[in-house]
Amino acid sequence: MTAEALGAVSAKWLAAGLSTVPADRAAAEDGVRLAYRSAGLRPPKHIVWFASPLAAARAAALLTGLSTVAPDGGVAFQLSSQGCPPVAGTAGPSVRAAVRTKPWAAARAEVHALLGPDGWAALWSACGADAWRMVNDRVAVPLRTHLRSELPAHARAVLLDAVGGQHDAGWLAAFDAVADAPAPAAEFPDYGAAVTGSGGSSGSGSGSGSGGGAALLAVQRLAGLAGVARAAGWWWPYADVAILTERPVELHRDNIGRLHAADAPAVRFRDGFGLHAWRGMPIPPDLVRRLSRLTHQEIASERNAELRRVMLEHFGYERYLREAGAHRVGEDECGVLWQLRFADDEPLTMVEVVNSTPEPDGTSRVYWLRVPPDTRTARGGVAWTFGLAEAEYRPLVET
């Protein structure tokens, strides 16, 4: 498979992993049944849907008999309305290991044997790593952490039963690439010798060579999981009940893929469950409401250093230095060095620089550069921004 084709597979799964369109419920339910059959299990008696992972986790806690979890009337009503008795024990035991863990491990072992260590590493780098980083690391992990905090301590065990659905995009992309079309030996060292056939997607691939056939059969056993991942969000597989969730209705990220929104949840589900984040860092909802009317006194009194940094970034470093009474450390031909100390964090240190080239209206623009806290001179700070030592910095023209 060419680099371009691998990129296309990765892009397809990245789009699925970040999708906010309504779930394709029929396709997802077909995927669930196929995943159970592929694991040698009968399909679940009930497939039920919830608007968010939080609601689904509460349903899982109720149906698995965690007696210490207080009954949730809303969850019970939704279960009843979908024909599933809201009774402890209805779900049966978790079948996650059979449906997800074992098939994944078997497929990985067979594909790794087919491609060899170098081929597997190259495949993962070309097709799985980017989707894994953008979807799992930057969306699923913070969402799971937040979800855990929203559940009572005694109910958090149900998160161990969850399958990522769309958030499994990273590793599904790599397996899908194996099924989609074999790569030439030049790209994956052991690929060409082992695979002589070609296949379709991970839902329907078939190989003509013995090595390729083995790999494709392993990937085919993931077809049900892939079907759910293309069509829905997180889900919980139990012997008698499968609990599925809708995808989020909103997902906001910054330019490098981190969850980020200044005035709304960075991830929001239809029932209101969501996660607020600033440049990848989860933040409390009440902070989002306060950001637009912050004062420098509030920032100074914030005891959480990480939240204080979020507040500073939104408030503006220049404004904060001016309003909070920063200490003027010194001035030289490169600018003015300012510093403001905190009791429990490194000092905020910045250089005020005046552009030597006037604007068209004759004014000179002022820039603020954040520099390391141990900076001693404005020249040293400006030099640091260019990756130079102070003695090496000799500007001829400033632009």
Predicted regions and their residues:
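Short, glycine-biased loop/turn motifs at secondary-structure junctions and
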Residues: 1-203, 207-399
